[in-house]
């Protein structure tokens, strides 16, 4: 395989990167972006800096690191990450992460990797998010590659899945880069982090004759990200509520609204746990399984690591006790923390055209389900 086989989905090459930097620097939205990332510098200075970047690494080390710093300073009280000692800076991994926030799950991991001597990863970039040229340019200059969402005919879905599988294997084995991908299509809305069996099946499509080798060669590393205050918790509650009555249809601009809400909403403490990579030894124990059973078993391996590594906060224990009418976890939070959480729950009362008790139960479930999954 050659990189040109993936021109339709890959990130920008060096020449395309230079052209994109010029477009970003001269876009109509640049003054707004500049003011957020570099509030104390003039637009002219920042425009010149962006236009002069020569490599992705320069862009990520300077501007994207600054973006993450601003997010952390403005909306996170404490950011931590652990588990990097399980990996080698020279290794090429497939980071499979739970997915709670459209942008920050992957972006905060890149920030941590960069600050600890690891190269950043390529990142999956949903085609549905490619709403304009500026977003495409920023994404593809950050090593993002396009992933088509399910839809169309079965034949087309198979073709795009096989193409994605080929690309993932090419990046890790031949290009010598790592990749970040979510454990499922779309974000977790209800607090249950579960790996989609179809994702594992897709990984195996590019090595159909040896299911053990297919997974082992990708060097899968499960990742768990935990937010003290769930990203877009009210928006997720409303979406889950609407889904109770009819198939949910996204509204125009909804993804962008979720991205902006996720960036700006107070998140409290945020922790990323990099789990032990999957080993060939544990995969060999699954050798006698059928392909379908194997895909399910590998997904369970990831779920076990991610759920075990997920960091619980007082909000999770409070929600559990409230939802199930117990005091089981009362030693894990204070009365003040409980009152703060209840104040957030009461915000749902503004949506008086909905069944408020149902809304509250959904909201509590988002926070309580990670406790159930331990």
Regions found by a protein language model. Name each.
Residues 1-93, 99-110, 114, 136, ...:
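Membrane-anchoring hydrophobic helices of lipid-metabolizing enzymes
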Residues 20, 25, 35, 51, ...:
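A sequence-composition feature that detects small, non-aromatic residues
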Residues 52, 56, 150, 197-203, ...:
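General structural signal for secondary-structure boundaries
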Residues 56, 156-160, 291:
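Residue-level preference for long, well-ordered alpha-helices that form the structural scaffold
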Residues 63, 159-164, 294, 298:
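Soluble or luminal CAZymes and related metallo-dependent hydrolases
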Residues 67, 73-278, 345-349:
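Soluble catalytic domains of membrane acyltransferases
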Residues 244-323:
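A cross-taxonomic marker for long C-terminal extensions/tails that follow the last structured domain
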Residues 306-374:
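Long, low-complexity C-terminal extensions of enzymes
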């Amino acid at each position: 395989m050659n990189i040109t086989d993936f021109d339709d989905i890959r990130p920008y090459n060096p020449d395309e990167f230079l052209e994109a930097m010029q477009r970003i620097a001269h876009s109509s939205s640049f003054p707004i972006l500049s003011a957020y990332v570099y509030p104390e510098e003039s637009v002219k200075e920042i425009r010149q800096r962006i236009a002069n970047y020569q490599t992705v690494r320069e862009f990520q080390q300077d501007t994207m690191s600054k973006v993450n710093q601003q997010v952390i300073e403005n909306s996170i009280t404490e950011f931590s990450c652990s588990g990097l000692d399980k990996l080698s800076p020279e290794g090429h991994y497939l980071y499979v992460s739970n997915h709670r926030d459209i942008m920050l799950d992957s972006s905060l991991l890149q920030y941590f990797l960069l600050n600890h001597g690891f190269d950043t990863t390529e990142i999956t970039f949903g085609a549905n998010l490619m709403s304009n040229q500026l977003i495409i340019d920023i994404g593809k200059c950050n090593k993002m590659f396009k992933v088509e969402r399910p839809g169309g005919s079965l034949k087309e879905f198979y073709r795009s899945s096989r193409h994605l599988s080929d690309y993932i294997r090419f990046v890790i084995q031949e290009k010598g880069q790592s990749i970040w991908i979510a454990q499922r299509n779309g974000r977790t809305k209800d607090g249950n982090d579960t790996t989609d069996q179809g994702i594992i099946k897709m990984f195996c499509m590019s090595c159909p004759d040896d299911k053990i080798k297919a997974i082992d060669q990708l060097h899968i590393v499960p990742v768990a990200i935990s937010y003290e205050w769930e990203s877009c918790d009210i928006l997720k509650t409303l979406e889950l509520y609407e889904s109770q009555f009819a198939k949910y249809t996204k509204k125009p601009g909804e993804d962008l609204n979720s991205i902006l809400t996720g960036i700006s909403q107070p998140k409290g403490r945020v922790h990323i746990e990099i789990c032990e990579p999957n080993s060939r030894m544990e995969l060999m124990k699954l050798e006698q399984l059928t392909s379908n059973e194997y895909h399910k078993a590998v997904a369970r391996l990831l779920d076990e690591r991610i759920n075990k590594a997920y960091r619980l906060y007082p909000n999770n224990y409070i929600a559990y006790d409230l939802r199930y009418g117990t005091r089981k976890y009362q030693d894990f939070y204070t009365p003040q923390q409980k009152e703060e959480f209840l104040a957030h729950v009461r915000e749902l009362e503004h949506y008086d055209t909905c069944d408020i008790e149902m809304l509250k139960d959904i909201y509590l479930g988002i926070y309580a389900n990670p406790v159930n999954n331990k």
